[in-house]
From Swiss-Prot:
The lineage of its organism: Bacteria, Pseudomonadati, Pseudomonadota, Gammaproteobacteria, Enterobacterales. This is Uncharacterized protein YkfJ. InterPro entries: RtcB-like_sf (IPR036025). It comes from the Bacteria. GO terms for biological process: RNA processing. The gene is ykfJ.
């Protein structure tokens, strides 16, 4: 069985995606929070990862890409997985 990520990238809208297998259960509140985050000004893409779960207002286990605007509330308290700056 050949595995590749493209098989598991699922578009939920033009700006919202998840990366998850068919067998992975994701809480509906986390999906709702992805859509809420995607509606923020200048937010271009929101992607829920396999560890996606609801947070306090915004989802945890997701990647966010915005242009011209930085959202400090999107930074986790421990800074895990943050990349702030130009994309390489």
């Amino acid at each position: 069985m050949e595995w590749y990520m493209g098989k598991y990238i699922r578009p939920l809208s033009d700006a919202v995606f998840t990366i998850a297998s068919d067998d992975l259960w994701i809480e509906s509140l986390a999906i709702q929070q992805l859509h809420t985050t995607a509606n923020l000004p200048n937010m271009q893409r929101v992607v829920g990862m396999p560890d996606l779960h609801p947070g306090r207002g915004y989802p945890i286990g997701a990647a966010f890409f915005s242009v011209g605007r930085f959202y400090p509330t999107r930074r986790r308290g421990n800074g895990a997985g943050n990349r702030n700056g130009p994309l390489l």
